[in-house]
Amino acid sequence: MLAAFVTIKVKPGSEADFEKTAKELVAKVQASEPGCKLYELSRSDQPHTYHFMERYVDQDAVATHRATEHYKSLGRQMGQYMDGAPVIIRLTEV
């Protein structure tokens, strides 16, 4: 299994718009990507900060995820609300 822990900071005042778009992405991933075993959005206790927790069966599932139209289009939409680049920690199960 492969996993990612992604931290995203959003511009103040854009939280609701970011959440709406991110929740749409979560729903589409969960409904259509069998190789993705976990795709979850959480709000941090830090202001304007969110985390995605992702878990995939293998590298092919990660590649499939990144190639989907919903990832590309909704990812672009989320970008307008972000305050800087996301911080991505990639993990491999031992």
For the regions a language model picked out, list residue spans one by one.
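N-terminal first-folded block
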Residues: 2-32
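An amphipathic, aromatic/His-enriched active-site/gating alpha helix that lines ligand/cofactor pockets
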Residues: 24, 28-36, 55-89
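Short, well-ordered beta-strand segments in beta-rich or mixed alpha/beta enzyme
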Residues: 2-9, 38-66
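Glycine-rich beta-strand-turn "strand-cap" elements at beta-sheet edges
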Residues: 2, 40-48, 75-94
